[in-house]
C-alpha cells in the first residue's frame, strides 16, 4: 500500500471521528466523565446531626428569612445546638432549683403528710448552729448526720465526737435519737431534732454518762441551718 492511499485513509478516519463527536453534542449524548462523589469534598454527614439540623441540611431554603426579603441559609452545624429564639424580643431566663434542693422539698412534703422515715432522710448532711448556746462560746457547733454509717458527728473547734445511732424514732416533726460514743461506749447521748422547715432544725441534747442523765443545757443545743458550701453559708461569730 502506497503512501498517498494511507494519507487518504487517515483523513477519512479523522473526518468520521469529528462527525461522531459533533453528532453526540447535537443530540445531548455527552461522553461520560468521572465526577468525584460529594462526600469527598467534606460534606457534613447529616445522619450524625439532631433531627432539626438534619431537616435544615436537607432543606436549607426553609431557613430563609422571608420577613426581611433576604435569603440567608443557616449552617446546620450550629442550628442543632442553637438556643430557642427569645419570646417577645427579650431573652427568657429561668432559674432552675438545684436537684438536691428539689429532692429535699419533696422529702419535706412527704414528711408533712406523715410518711415515716422521710425526716430522717431529710436530716442527712451537715448542719451549723446559728443561735450559739451559752456553753459553746464563740464557736459555731456543727452536726453531721451520716445515714449510710448510722452515725452523728458533733464538731466544735478542735473537738470532734462520733456517736453511733442505736435507735431512732419519729413523731410528727421531731426525730429522737439514742446514740453512744464510738470511743467510749458508756457515754450516751439522747438527741431530739425538731424540724422548723426543710432547712432549719432545733436540737436538744441530753448527756447520759453511766446511766446518769445530765440535764443542764448542752453546748449542742440550739437552732441549726443546713450548711451550703460557700462563703455566705457560715454566719459570722
From Swiss-Prot:
Keyword Signal: yes
UniProt region (Disordered), positions on chain: 52-96
Signal peptide bounds: 1-28
Keywords: Signal
InterPro entries recorded: Pallilysin (IPR041037)
Keyword Transcription regulation annotated: no
Pfam families on file: Pallilysin
Name of the protein described by the UniProt record: Uncharacterized protein TP_0751
Biased composition (Polar residues): 63-75
